[in-house]
Amino acid sequence: MPRRREVPKREILPDPKYGNVELSKFMNVIMEGGKKAVAERIIYGALDFIEKKNPDKDPLEAFTVAINNVKPMVEVKSRRVGGANYQVPVEVRPVRRLALSMRWIKEAARKRGEKSMALRLANELMEATEGRGGAMKKRDEVHRMAEANRAFSHFRF
C-alpha cells in the first residue's frame, strides 16, 4: 500500500431524473462495462414499476428505505492470532455500509427468476422495504456470523 497521501473521494453527481446522489451511486453499482445508459434504463424502469404497483408511495422513498434496511451494522474479519484464524466481529463504517447494501441488492436481484432486470430489481427493492428478500437474508446471515463469533470481539483491529 502506498504511504504517500490519502486519495480524495470523488464527488458523484446526482442522477438527472430524481436529483439523488445515492441513486447515482447505485447506478454505478448496477453498471457493467461502462454502459451507464443501460444501468439508467434498468433503475428508472424498476422505480417506474414500483410506482405502478404502489401509486401512493414515492419510489425514491421506497429505494431509500430498502437501502437502509439492508445496511449491515457489523461484519466479521479474519484475524490471525497464534497460528489460528479467528472471525472477529467489527463495526462497519458508514461508506462501506452503503456500498455493501447496494452490492447485496444487486446480487440478490440478479439471482431472481423474473424476465427483465428492471422487474427483478423492483421486486427485490420492494421486498427489502418489507424486510424480506435475498439481500435481507444476506444481511441477517452476516449479522448471525458476527453474533456467533462475539466471543472473539476482544481481538480488535
UniProtKB/Swiss-Prot annotation:
Q: Mind telling me which GO cellular component terms the entry cites?
A: small ribosomal subunit
Query: Which keywords belong to this entry?
Result: Ribonucleoprotein, Ribosomal protein, RNA-binding, rRNA-binding, tRNA-binding
- Top-level taxon of origin: Bacteria
The UniProt entry, under CDD domains, shows: uS7_Bacteria
InterPro entries, sorted: Ribosomal_uS7, Ribosomal_uS7_bac/org-type, Ribosomal_uS7_CS, Ribosomal_uS7_dom, Ribosomal_uS7_dom_sf
The free-text function statement in the UniProt record for this protein reads:
One of the primary rRNA binding proteins, it binds directly to 16S rRNA where it nucleates assembly of the head domain of the 30S subunit. Is located at the subunit interface close to the decoding center, probably blocks exit of the E-site tRNA.
Assembly behavior: Part of the 30S ribosomal subunit. Contacts proteins S9 and S11.
Give the family this protein belongs to, as stated in its UniProt record. Answer: Belongs to the universal ribosomal protein uS7 family.
Protein name, as recorded? Small ribosomal subunit protein uS7
Q: Which organism is it from?
A: Variovorax paradoxus (strain S110)
Phylogenetic classification of the source organism: Bacteria, Pseudomonadati, Pseudomonadota, Betaproteobacteria, Burkholderiales
Q: Which gene encodes it?
A: rpsG
